[in-house]
UniProtKB/Swiss-Prot annotation:
Designated name of the protein: Serine/threonine-protein kinase STE20
Coarse class of the protein's main subcellular location: cytoplasm
EC number: 2.7.11.1
Cellular location(s): Cytoplasm; Nucleus
Keyword Phosphoprotein tagged: no
Region ranges (Disordered): 1-42, 86-185, 236-284, 311-351, 499-551, 592-663
Stretches with biased composition (Polar residues): 1-11, 168-185, 248-264, 312-325, 536-551
SUPFAM superfamilies for this protein: Protein kinase-like (PK-like)
Substrates-to-products reaction catalysed: L-seryl-[protein] + ATP = O-phospho-L-seryl-[protein] + ADP + H(+); L-threonyl-[protein] + ATP = O-phospho-L-threonyl-[protein] + ADP + H(+)
Taxonomic lineage of the native organism: Eukaryota, Fungi, Dikarya, Ascomycota, Saccharomycotina
Gene3D superfamilies named in the record: CRIB domain (3.90.810.10), Phosphorylase Kinase, domain 1 (3.30.200.20), Transferase(Phosphotransferase) domain 1 (1.10.510.10)
Amino acid sequence: MSKVSGANETLQGALAPLSHMGGGGDATLLKDEGQVELPRGPGVLNVQVLPEEGHAHLQDLEGYKSMDPRQSESASTDVSEMLQHTASLDDPIQFTRVSTSSVTSNSSSDPRESGDTQETGSRRGCSTEEQAPAGAERVSGQDQDSWDVEEVVAEPRSGIDVTPVGDVTNSTIRASGRSAESTSHYLDEYSDTRYSSSSPSSGSRKLSTTIITPEKNVVAQALHCYADNYESPLNDLMSSGDERSSSVRETSFENASSDTNANLNGGRASTGESMRSPPPATGLPNGFVHTQASAPALPVLPAKSPFRAVQSPFSGTRKSRNSANLAELSLPRTSTSSASSMEQRKSRGGRMKVVLSSFVQNIRRNSQGEKRRSGTAMKISTPYNATHVHHVGVDSRTGEYTGLPEEWERLLASSGISKKEQQQHPQAVMDIVKFYQDVTGTSGEDKVFKTFNVSSTNACELSSSPSFKTPSLSSITRFEGSHEAYNSAYHSPMLQSPMGFHDPQHDEKFIPSRPAPRPPGGAAPKTDFTSPLAYDSQSATATPKNQRFSNQSSGFFSLARKATLNKNKQQLPPIPSAAAASAPITQPGSTANIPYIKPAENPVSAPSKSIPPSLPAVPTPPPPIEKDPPLRDLEREREREHSSAKQGQLALERKREEKRRRNQKLQAKLAEICSPGDPSKIYRNLVKIGQGASGGVYTAYEIGTNASVAIKQMNLEKQPKKELIINEILVMKGSRHNNIVNFIDSYLLKGDLWVIMEYMEGGSLTDVVTHCILTEGQIAAVSRETLRGLHFLHSKGVIHRDIKSDNILLSMDGNIKLTDFGFCAQINETNLKRTTMVGTPYWMAPEVVSRKEYGPKVDIWSLGIMIIEMIEGEPPYLNETPLRALYLIATNGTPKLKDADSLSPVLKRFLSWCLQVSPNDRATAMELLYDKFIVEVAEANASLAPLVKLARMKKLAEKMDADSDDNRTD
């Protein structure tokens, strides 16, 4: 509701004080409601507060036109008569829309039910103190002071905007673009609004409202009076006005005449705010001015424009058509509240919330639109580099394996493991499959399954001690550390560990097993024994590590045992490795190629492969419009191939660079380990007695002492795992023992490594067990010396992991020493168990085959198998295929002897203690050294000397027989 405040002045001849009315006043006002034609322009007038008890009806005022829609008759007196002496201004008055629909809907359409009678008394008591005197002088156009027009502006609390469309009574005031909700909220917010009436005895009715002055006592008195009388009944009638200054609400007064516009001329108080000219309001027959003030009154200055501009919430098309005839009211702006700053902050906070909410919604809408656009444009190509992963399982109903690759099925079929055995021990077969997967799962050089006798060279071709053999591709491994001396000087990542050895599981391979004799009718190639100084590159051809060498000085002929002769009849099963495609596997002792099975492609094991095996098939759609997507797919595929090729090339270059740096570090470390000089000037009479995968083995005599030594020459370029060599050298350097082959010295000459070791001219134990029969005393002697060497290694935390007859060397006087430490590994307190797959499968312990943790007792199991080898001439399951041998080791546990009744109980007890399936029940090296079989039955080492000589003569006889056969064939 609006109120008009004049400085002790009233409107001339038109306005009179409102008379106090009782309840009957409401009925008088209601009867004429509905006959008034409200303007359709945007304006606000709160009509609820007019028909109050004790106040004069507005319809009785002269020149006042009621805003009630039910008012049928207009007032008799025109406002133009009231303002006939006032000067006209050129600037139009700013109008806002007036809506009464929200007022009448929320309060009451019937004044009798509106509850106005409850507010009349309190209003009457408060307003009489502030009303203008009845006999005040009338205002002339020249002497008129400023009129303060306040506007009650409704701000919806619930955020619901009441549209004025279609409602002829909708004339709620809207300021700053806000919609009105209900009149019930107006007076609650504007608690400083006062309505008063003059004495009813006055001749003419006057509209007197609260005088707004900058004096603090008047404002405080008015607020106090209103708080006592109006705060309670008007709690719900609040609204916010202008957001920038809400301390003083200014109202606009509408002229009742639609064709006569009165202009009020007055001064405007400067408030420190920039004054803006209001835009012309159109669409209203009468003008409203909406101004505000938020600062105390200051001295009046000449005003260029008497109105402060208020932006209309309506578009320009809805402005009043009569704006040209509107006059402008000059209104002073004053401040009546000290709480304006707080309300300003609240208003600014609300505005900021609206801005931020709109900003967030726009961002969300844009992001959703981008997602929809990107989702429609995205296309998924067909898979490339696809691989099929096999999951091997066992059918519980049929007992058959499911998910086996085709090559594995053929491997099992050729391994000799029957269906019945597979059904009886499915888990064991699964372990064997995993075993093969682990062995063949590596890539590159390590993906060569040369575990067993897969050589095209005759077993009788060369003769040498196994200690002179270099590790081949099949005997490649890493170790989790090195010796203490090596660990303190060298810090290669591949050789670091708590104890120095680095031993990743996936690099472990089988050690070659016993070779088979040459096939019938096959001629063994002749061997030329030359000095290493005249050694050329052709002499470094790859020869398997399992070659048995005979001494050149042997001139006796002998025949191999029958059991060993049968080994040439068996062929290895096809091996599912990638190397099989490029290097066909040959039968031991023959040159015939064995068909291989092409393994399933595994891109994980070959990351350098950049081009997919095949491009996805491009369909040929009949419509021409569908040709573009396949072309785009092909283009993308080509781009992927190109990028993959680049990535693969970069990866290959990085790998080569890393390998080069690693080789440089290994070369530097070898240079530190090796002694400077030329071994050809220190040793004389070098004679080649054997050939390894990466070099040859020679015998020589030291100049000055005439001591016989063995020289192991290795071409480092052909040695794929140089850390193995370093490991073996360091282990031998730190293992000075009577039962360990002693390391003498090493040299690095022109890229070749020369290792000088103690020479065991008697050869290996393999020559003895294959050509001679040992007694229990001799078996006990060999076991004793082996146990002493193992006890020494185990005390150092070293596991040999490859105890077999090939790695037991004898001298001519019968002394026994361990050799071939290329596969040894160290353990410590933090790593007491190992899980790597290493060693020769026929001598493997069950825990190794089953991929369980193991410790030093795996060497004790291998010793037990070696004892069976000394008893029967070969290890158990040697005539079986390797896969079936592993299966039998895992399922049978302790192997059975062919003629156990011929053995003494002491030997059987000792053997049973070594071959316990459970490592916890298996004996240690120290316990076995105190066993009765070792203490009482073992003979002296000299008892082995005749066997060594006999084995050498038989081996030489076999070689001479082979040479004669070759001559007859030629």
